[in-house]
């Protein structure tokens, strides 16, 4: 009980900054303050925090049924595995205020698939509660104002507009409020959002906008702050590698070029231990040789294949890199020059190929999963086996 009182006192202190969403809730004063803060987190796409606060509101007032409504809103409406419908079915609608019941009715429509009457219900509750921040926000996607719907909401409900300003920031970044992206205005909108609500999502948004602008250092710095908000299993963790790799792209490309050279040297020298540094057990290296025979999986057994080639030289050059948008995969294209002789002959054969390789980022570093070689220019590939 002591811990509960401390918890309640902590959340109650949030009332100084919480944005009031519901005017006629049946929750008691303390739960009402916590609930409003929970809705602010939900509006700002911080569902995990919102659910935690909703549970806290329910702990302080068992009759605060709107807390269960928020938990249902945060759940998925997927018909196969989502739990929103089950959670809604368990709600005692007799304990909901009229505004809360309107929210409930709209959520029920989201569980009906193609048979829903969401638009009809939306029109009805908007007419009934034109001055409710909650009702106007949860129905905002039905507006025909496009991106201006967020500005309209911010003007009408300035105290509840943290999430709206976050969306306005994207509108400026996408160029929806003019002829071109306006990053300065986008950052100002994020600043307004953060002034009202200091949650992590606005930091994540600032990072995304910085990345759109090409400022990956700024993106990385803000993403780290978003993760720091609650670091374990943070939903913002996944973007950190993307921003970090962009910041360090030149070094990364240099290291990948060297890795490609090293793995090829390991193959030519039949150094299995060195080769294993550059491949992963989770995905086999699939290779296509310059003799244009079938693709095959390059495994440890490949080192035992007989070869009648004796290399005089083998050099890789002119690397180019094509990264996936999230920087977790890269295609290397390059050229190889050299010469070799075949057993029983002193004739030197000019070798010239163009090649590509695919590398993926793993928990154990970058690993190669595919290579392809083909004759290029006036030279030859390796002979057929």
Listing of model-derived features with the role each one plays in the protein:
Residues 352-382:
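Short beta-strand edge/turn micro-motifs at domain boundaries
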Residues 54, 82-94, 115-126, 146-158, ...:
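Alpha-helical repeat scaffolds
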Residues 272-326, 335, 349-351:
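A solvent-exposed, acidic/Ser-Thr-rich amphipathic alpha-helical stretch
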């Amino acid at each position: 009980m002591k811990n509960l009182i401390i918890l309640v006192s902590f959340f109650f202190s949030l009332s100084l900054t919480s944005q009031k969403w519901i005017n006629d809730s049946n929750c008691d004063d303390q739960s009402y303050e916590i609930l409003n803060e929970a809705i602010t987190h939900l509006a700002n796409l911080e569902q995990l925090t919102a659910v935690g606060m909703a549970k806290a509101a329910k702990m302080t007032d068992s009759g605060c049924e709107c807390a269960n409504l928020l938990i249902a809103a945060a759940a998925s409406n997927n018909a196969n595995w989502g739990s929103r419908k089950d959670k809604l079915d368990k709600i005692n609608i007799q304990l909901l205020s009229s505004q809360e019941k309107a929210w409930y009715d709209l959520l029920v429509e989201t569980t009906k698939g193609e048979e829903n009457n969401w638009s009809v219900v939306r029109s009805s509750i908007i007419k009934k509660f034109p001055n409710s921040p909650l009702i106007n926000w949860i129905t905002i996607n039905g507006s025909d104002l496009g991106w201006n719907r967020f500005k309209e909401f911010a003007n009408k409900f300035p105290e509840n507009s943290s999430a709206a300003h976050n969306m306005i920031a994207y509108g400026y970044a996408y160029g929806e409020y003019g002829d071109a992206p306006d990053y300065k205005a986008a950052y100002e909108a994020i600043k307004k959002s953060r002034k009202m609500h200091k949650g992590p999502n606005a930091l994540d948004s600032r990072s995304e906008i910085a990345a759109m602008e090409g400022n990956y250092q700024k993106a990385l710095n803000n993403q780290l702050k978003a993760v720091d908000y609650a670091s374990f299993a943070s939903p913002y963790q996944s973007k950190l590698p993307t921003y970090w790799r962009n910041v360090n792209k030149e070094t990364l490309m240099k290291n990948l070029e060297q890795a490609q050279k090293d793995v090829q040297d390991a193959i030519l020298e039949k150094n299995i231990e060195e080769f294993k540094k550059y491949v992963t057990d989770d995905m086999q290296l699939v290779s296509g040789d310059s003799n244009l025979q079938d693709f095959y999986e390059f495994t440890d057994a490949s080192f035992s294949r007989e070869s009648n080639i004796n290399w005089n030289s083998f050099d890789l050059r002119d690397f180019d890199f094509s990264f996936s948008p999230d920087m977790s995969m890269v295609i290397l294209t390059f050229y190889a020059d050299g010469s070799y002789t075949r057993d029983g002959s002193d004739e030197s054969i000019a070798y010239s190929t163009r090649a590509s390789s695919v590398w993926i980022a793993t928990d154990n570093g970058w690993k190669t999963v595919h290579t392809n070689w083909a004759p290029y220019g006036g030279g030859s590939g390796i002979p057929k086996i």
